Every structure is written in C-alpha cells, then in structure tokens.
Amino acid sequence: MIPLSDTIKNKLNYGLYIVSTPIGNLSDITIRAINILENSDYILCEDTRISKKLLDRYKIKSKLISNHKFNEIKNLNKIIEILKSEKIVSLVSDAGTPAISDPGRIIINECIKNKINIYPIPGPSAVSTAVSISGFSEKYFFY
C-alpha cells in the first residue's frame, strides 16, 4: 500500500467521496480508494460489519457511521452538518459503487442542494467485467 503523507492529506478537499469497493475479491480495490478511506474523517457504510472486513484488511481506522436504506433519511441532517464542518467523508456500499442499486442517492442529492463538493472514486464494475468476456461488440452494448 502507498499511504498518503500528512501533507497530501492536507491537500484533500473536504466533501463527500463516493468510493467504489470490491465486488467479490477484497484485493480488487484501487490504491486511490484505500488512501481516500484511510484519510477520511468518517466513512458512511451500508453495513458496518461488511465494510469493517475491508477496512480491517487495509488497517483503516476512520470513524464509521451506519448509512443504509432504513436510516439514511434519519441521519441526513447529522451527516450534512459533519460535511459543512469541512470534514472528509467517504460513502461506501457493501460491494461496488454507492448509489448504483445501493444507498447514496439521498445524501448525494442533499450535498448538491447544499453545494457540498462530491468526488467519485472509481472502482470495479460488474457490468464492464461481464461485457469484456462476452464476445459481444461494444457497438451493441447499452447501459
């Protein structure tokens, strides 16, 4: 792992980082995603128990906040206040990219309304992985 130095952490912009996580193999995570999570003040997790397995693997000790479909509206004001206090907050889902068939849309829309910066951190994609071995021409693939 290539950790960010304190000087690089100071250069990270505060706001909400939408961090893609592995979709099956914990090794399928980008160095950038690890560094962002490692330097987050808070990580919003769809299921903290599942996220903790990934975070423990990479020795990431950021504070976790449960953020799933049953509590995301209830937690919204608290999270927006944290973001307005110029913190680095990451949002992760159990697997893949948050807000793509996972929680995240509500907090993202609220950040847009409040002019809070949002930064997407790309990662693995089940769709492109499946298409890559399908034998289909990309001309006939629509998403």
Each language-model region and where it sits:
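Structural motif
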Residues: E46, N67, V92-D94, Y119-I121
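Glycine-rich, highly charged phosphate/nucleotide-binding loops
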Residues: N71-I79
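Glycine-rich, flexible N-terminal cofactor/catalytic loop recognition
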Residues: I2-F70
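Loop/turn-to-beta-strand initiation segments
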Residues: Y14-L16, S85-S90
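Alpha-helix capping/helix-boundary segments
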Residues: R49-S51, T97, A126
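Class I SAM-dependent methyltransferase SAM-binding "motif I" and its flanking Rossmann-like core
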Residues: I107-Y143
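Short glycine-rich anion-binding loops that position phosphate/pyrophosphate groups of nucleotides
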Residues: I23-L26, D94-P98
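Acidic, metal-coordinating catalytic cores used for nucleic-acid/nucleotide bond scission
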Residues: N71, A95-P103
